[in-house]
Swiss-Prot record:
Organism, scientific name: Gentiana triflora
InterPro entries linked to this entry: CAT-like_dom_sf, Plant_metabolite_acyltrans
Residues forming the catalytic site: H174 (proton acceptor), D411 (proton acceptor)
Identification of the protein by name: Anthocyanin 5-aromatic acyltransferase
Tissues expressed in: Expressed in the outer epidermal cells of petals, but not in sepals, leaves or stems.
Protein modification: The N-terminus is blocked.
Length: 469
C-alpha cells in the first residue's frame, strides 16, 4: 500500500450524506467574509486519543462507526460534501456547490502508523513533518467543470497506533468555514459517533445555519475584496498538491490560571496611572508570546541584519463578529464571519522593560478599534486586506484558534483528546491559542519555529516567568 512518511494507508474511501438527505443539489454564494480565505486550502486540526486496543478492533469497530457517523453528520452539513467552484473566466464569482449526481463526497483515509504515539502527542519539541504525515494531502483542484475549477472542501485521515492511540486529522478549505464553524462540525461528528444518533444536535447547539442571506453587504465589500484578491489567487493557483516539507519544530506551552494572573499583575503594576487597558486572558497570553517572539528573533539574527529598533512590529488576529453585525448573525451561522485586527508597536518598545504592557495595550487597542467602532464593525472593512498585505513578513506574527473554543470537548466515545493540535501554523508565522486540557481557565499555546529560533524562544519564555516568582 501507499506510504506517507511512516504512515501506511490501509483504505481510501468517499463518504457521502445518507441517501435520505433532502438536498440533492445545493449551491451557496461566497460572501465577502469568505473571499479573503479563497486561497487557503489547509485549515488543519489534529486530535490524538489514547486508545489501548489492537488494530483489529480499530478496523472492525471504530472505522465502520466513524464512517456511519460522518455520513449522518453530513446530512446536516451538506455543503461540506461539496466543492468550491472557482471561475476560470473573469466576470464570474466563486460559489460552493454540492451535487449528489456528481458523486460529491468527503475523502476519508484509514491509516496505520508505527511512530511513537507519546512523542507525537507530547508538548515537547516535535518535528513538524512527523505531524503532517498524519494528514491526507487534499488536492488543490480535482477537476474542471464548464467554466470552473472544482476544489474540494474537506478531507479526513484517521490513523491507528495499535494498542496506543488514534489520530483524527481534518483538513478544511478556509473559504467554507472559520475555526468556530469547523469546531462545531467536528463536535457534531464526535457527538453522533458517541451516541449513535443525530436527534439531539439542536439541543447540543450543533445544528448549523447556512443561510447566506443573513450577511448584508452594506459597504460594497464583495467587489473590493474580490478585486484585491486577484493577484493572490493567481499566485496560489500555480502551487501543487505535494506533501509539504518543513524546516520547523513544534512545541506546546501551557499557562495555568495562576500563571496568567502573574502576568496580569505585572501589567497592572507597570501600568501605574496610565489609562485603563484591556487585561484579559487573550490579551495577556498573546502579548506575552508576542514580546518573547520579538526578543527571540534578536537572539538568532546576525548583527548585520539586526532589527531597526524604531521599525514597527505587527500582531495580527481575527475576531468573531457574528453578534456585532446589523442585523446580528446567529451563533450557529456556518461560514466565515471574522473581523481582521492588527496590533502594532515599535521593536524598541516591545523589547524594553515595559514591553509586555505595550503589547497588551496594543492588542487591546486593536480590539477596541475594530469591535467597538461607533460606526459598526464593518465601517472600515475596505482597508482590512490592504492593511494586512502591507505588513513585512519578518515583522509579522499571527494567531489562530481561541481560548473560548472547547477543543478538548471533542469526544467520539473514547474520552476527551489527549492532545488537540492546529498544524496550520506551520505554513506561516503563526501561533495558536486554545483552552488548556488540564488546567481550568488555562491556555495552551502552539508554536512552530526553526529549531535555533525555538531554542531562543523557549529560553526567553521560561526566563520571563522565573522573573515573576
Amino acid at each position: 500500500m501507499e506510504q506517507i512518511q511512516m504512515v501506511k494507508v490501509l483504505e481510501k474511501c468517499q463518504v457521502t450524506p445518507p441517501s435520505d438527505t433532502t438536498d440533492v443539489e445545493l449551491s451557496l454564494p461566497v460572501t465577502f467574509f469568505d473571499i479573503p480565505w479563497l486561497h487557503l486550502n489547509k485549515m488543519q486540526s489534529l486530535l490524538f486519543y489514547d486508545f489501548p486496543y489492537p488494530r483489529t478492533h480499530f478496523l472492525d469497530t471504530v472505522i465502520p462507526n466513524l464512517k456511519a457517523s460522518l455520513s449522518l453528520t453530513l446530512k446536516h452539513y451538506v455543503p461540506l460534501s461539496g466543492n468550491l467552484l472557482m471561475p476560470i473566466k473573469s466576470g464570474e464569482m466563486p460559489k460552493f456547490q454540492y451535487s449528489r449526481d456528481e458523486g460529491d463526497s468527503i475523502t476519508l483515509i484509514v491509516a496505520e502508523s508505527d511512530q511513537d504515539f507519546d512523542y507525537l502527542k507530547g508538548h515537547q519539541l516535535v518535528d513538524s513533518n512527523d505531524l503532517h504525515g498524519l494528514f491526507y494531502v487534499m488536492p488543490r483542484v480535482i477537476r474542471t467543470m464548464q467554466d470552473y475549477k472544482v476544489i474540494p472542501l474537506v478531507a479526513v485521515q484517521v490513523t491507528v497506533f495499535p494498542n496506543r492511540g488514534i489520530a483524527v486529522a481534518l483538513t478544511a478549505h478556509h473559504s467554507i468555514a472559520d475555526a468556530k464553524s469547523f469546531v462545531m462540525f467536528i463536535n457534531a461528528w464526535a457527538y453522533i459517533n458517541k451516541f449513535g444518533k443525530d436527534a439531539d444536535l439542536l439541543s447540543a447547539n450543533l445544528l448549523p445555519s447556512f443561510d447566506r442571506s443573513i450577511i448584508k453587504d452594506l459597504y460594497g465589500l464583495e467587489e473590493t475584496f474580490w478585486n484585491e484578491m486577484q493577484d493572490v489567487l493567481e499566485m496560489f493557483s500555480r502551487f501543487g498538491s505535494k506533501p509539504p516539507r518543513f524546516n520547523k519544530v513544534r512545541a506546546t506551552y501551557v499557562l495555568s490560571l495562576a500563571e496568567i494572573q502573574k502576568l496580569k499583575n505585572k501589567v497592572l503594576n507597570l501600568r501605574g496611572s496610565e489609562p485603563t487597558i484591556r487585561v484579559t486572558t487573550f490579551t495577556m497570553t498573546c502579548g506575552y508570546v508576542w514580546t518573547c517572539m520579538v526578543k527571540s528573533k534578536d537572539d538568532v539574527v546576525s548583527e548585520e541584519s539586526s532589527n531597526d529598533e524604531n521599525e514597527l512590529e505587527y500582531f495580527s488576529f481575527t475576531a468573531d463578529c457574528r453578534g456585532l453585525l446589523t442585523p446580528p448573525c446567529p451563533p450557529n451561522y456556518f461560514g466565515n464571519c471574522l473581523a481582521s485586527c492588527v496590533a502594532k508597536a515599535t521593536h524598541k518598545e516591545l523589547v524594553g522593560d515595559k514591553g509586555l504592557l505595550v503589547a497588551v495595550a496594543a492588542i487591546g487597542e486593536a480590539i477596541e478599534k475594530r469591535l467597538h467602532n461607533e460606526k459598526g464593525v464593518l465601517a472600515d472593512a475596505k482597508t482590512w486586506l490592504s492593511e494586512s498585505n502591507g505588513i513585512p513578513s519578518k515583522r509579522f506574527l499571527g494567531i489562530t484558534g481561541s481560548p473560548k473554543f472547547d477543543s478538548y470537548g471533542v469526544d467520539f466515545g473514547w474520552g476527551k483528546p489527549a492532545k488537540f493540535d492546529i498544524t496550520s501554523v506551520d505554513y506561516a508565522e503563526l501561533i495558536y491559542v486554545i483552552q488548556s486540557r488540564d488546567f481550568e481557565k488555562g491556555v495552551e499555546i502552539g508554536v512552530s519555529l526553526p529549531k535555533i529560533h525555538m531554542d531562543a524562544f523557549a529560553k526567553i519564555f521560561e526566563e520571563g516567568f522565573c522573573s515573576l516568582s
